[in-house]
Amino acid sequence: MNEIKKAALHTIDAHANTFTAISDAIWDEPELSLKEFKAAALYTDALEKLGFTVQKNLCGIETAFSGSYGSGRPVIGILGEFDALSGLSQQSGAAEVQSVTPGGNGHGCGHNLLGA
């Protein structure tokens, strides 16, 4: 395994609890596209605590942001969606339909995980 991959895996493992907590919080409070204010705040706060420089309100979109860390190479870009969909409210860990709020918002495509 090369050194970059080892470093990436070490960093992911070191922050796994943070990533899981963010994912769970976003699952628990699903917000529709362009209205993910709580989720965006969770992400930007976490990035800032990890030493990233965060730009908020990208392109006039209140929930869009970017985080930069370090300089030089490699340059890595990641797009993470974190919006919910209407009508997909679901209890965590349930294999069959068990809505938290019937007809409410929920994460059916893993967007709570993609952003984290």
Predicted regions and their residues:
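Acidic/His- and Gly-rich active-site-bordering loop/insert found
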Residues: N2-H107, N112
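DPxDG-like acidic metal-binding loop motif
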Residues: G115-A116
